[in-house]
């Protein structure tokens, strides 16, 4: 069976967010399920969910996490530094797995490596799948630059550092699959990086 990446667009107040489904016809991992649990579950069909991974704790990315995971009793993974953000969406609940830099998830015949990349939030992570030539960047990096939060950057310098230190060294043809908007490549991000630095925090305005 061929391992593939499927995309599901989940509605959100600031515009649709990208839920990513990685796996084959038997089993999958769901990345950032958004807020439309019914829509994600419909897209999954009868494929088994091995894990639900949240790249960060903002509600528009994690609201459906528990409901999607519950169907197959799958664990939910989140970096512990985003626990307080997670609890805004899920009071009294905790994620099952506390992700760390370098952690690995396996699904079908591929591996997803956790890249700790704080800046957008204290616990933001990316997930690199060398086997499929893709990196899932959440809101660390969109096609047009670092993702703001409500038009502002809590830690613009930290976010740029995460991009420059952890993402740009990946192979140039790596697909960048963000938490919102269209995909891009590492090559395009590297080409645009200096302009993002020059624009500063006003980039998101």
Which stretches of residues belong to each language-model region?
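Active-site HxH/HxHxD metal-binding segment of metal-dependent hydrolases
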Residues: 14, 28, 35-111, 141, ...
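Metallo-beta-lactamase
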Residues: 28, 116, 122-205
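A generic secondary-structure signal marking the coil-to-beta-strand transition
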Residues: 4, 18, 27, 95, ...
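Hydrophobic/aromatic beta-strand patches that form the interior of the parallel beta-sheet core
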Residues: 6, 53, 77, 97-99, ...
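Conserved beta-strand hairpin/beta-sheet module of binuclear metal-dependent hydrolase folds
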Residues: 1-47, 126-138
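Residue-level detector of beta-strand structural context in well-folded domains
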Residues: 18-20, 97, 102-103, 125, ...
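Short Gly/Pro-enriched turn/cap motifs at secondary-structure boundaries
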Residues: 10-12, 96, 116-118
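Short beta-strand or tight-loop elements
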Residues: 3, 108-113, 123
């Amino acid at each position: 069976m061929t391992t593939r990446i499927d995309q599901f667009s989940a509605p959100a107040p600031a515009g649709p967010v990208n839920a990513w489904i990685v796996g084959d016809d038997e089993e999958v991992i769901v990345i950032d399920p958004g807020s439309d649990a019914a829509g994600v579950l419909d897209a999954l069909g009868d494929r088994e969910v091995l894990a639900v991974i949240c790249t960060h704790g903002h509600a528009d990315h994690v609201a459906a996490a528990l409901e999607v995971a519950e169907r197959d009793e799958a664990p939910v993974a989140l970096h512990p530094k985003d626990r307080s953000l997670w609890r805004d969406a899920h009071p009294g609940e905790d994620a099952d797995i506390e992700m760390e830099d370098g952690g690995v998830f396996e699904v079908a015949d591929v591996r997803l490596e956790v890249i700790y990349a704080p800046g957008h939030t204290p616990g933001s992570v990316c997930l690199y799948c060398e086997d499929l030539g893709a990196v899932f960047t959440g809101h660390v990096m969109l096609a047009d630059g670092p993702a703001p939060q409500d038009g502002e950057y809590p830690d613009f310098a930290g976010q740029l550092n995460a991009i420059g230190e952890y993402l740009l060294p990946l192979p140039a043809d790596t697909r960048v699959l963000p938490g919102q908007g269209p995909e891009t490549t590492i090559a395009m991000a590297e080409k645009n990086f200096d302009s993002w630095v020059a624009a500063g925090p006003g980039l998101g305005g």
